[in-house]
């Protein structure tokens, strides 16, 4: 399986899995569920250039991040749903 190496200030995020939701005995279909806004960074680019200097990303592989509801580009890789987003679309890093 090929891996994805994001360019520039982009990161690849694996959205947090939503468990199957039931209301009473009714199963809520995937199309009616809200998209998760939390995920794990699985790949990161080298950073962005400002004034000719490389500025490294603030997030790193393994970080759990929060991002905007409509951020990024959805892709499928190896049967997984992934999201490629810019670092500027990341709202914060979840810490324990």
Curated annotation (Swiss-Prot):
One annotated Gene Ontology cellular component of this protein: cytoplasm
Alphabetical UniProt keywords: Chaperone, Cytoplasm
Its GO biological process annotations read: chaperone cofactor-dependent protein refolding
Q: How does it assemble?
A: Heptamer of 7 subunits arranged in a ring. Interacts with the chaperonin GroEL.
Family assignment? Belongs to the GroES chaperonin family.
Tell me where on the tree of life, at the top rank, the source sits: Bacteria
Q: Main subcellular localization, coarse class?
A: cytoplasm
Xref: SUPFAM superfamilies: GroES-like
**InterPro entries the record matches:** Chaperonin_GroES, Chaperonin_GroES_sf, Chaprnonin_Cpn10_CS, GroES-like_sf
Q: Which Gene3D superfamilies match?
A: GroES chaperonin
PROSITE patterns linked: CHAPERONINS_CPN10
Q: Which GO terms describe its molecular function?
A: ATP binding; metal ion binding; protein folding chaperone; protein-folding chaperone binding; unfolded protein binding
The job of this chain, per UniProt, is described as: Together with the chaperonin GroEL, plays an essential role in assisting protein folding. The GroEL-GroES system forms a nano-cage that allows encapsulation of the non-native substrate proteins and provides a physical environment optimized to promote and accelerate protein folding. GroES binds to the apical surface of the GroEL ring, thereby capping the opening of the GroEL channel.
From the Swiss-Prot or TrEMBL record, give the protein name: Co-chaperonin GroES
Record PANTHER family: 10 KDA HEAT SHOCK PROTEIN, CO-CHAPERONIN GROES
Compartments (UniProt record): Cytoplasm
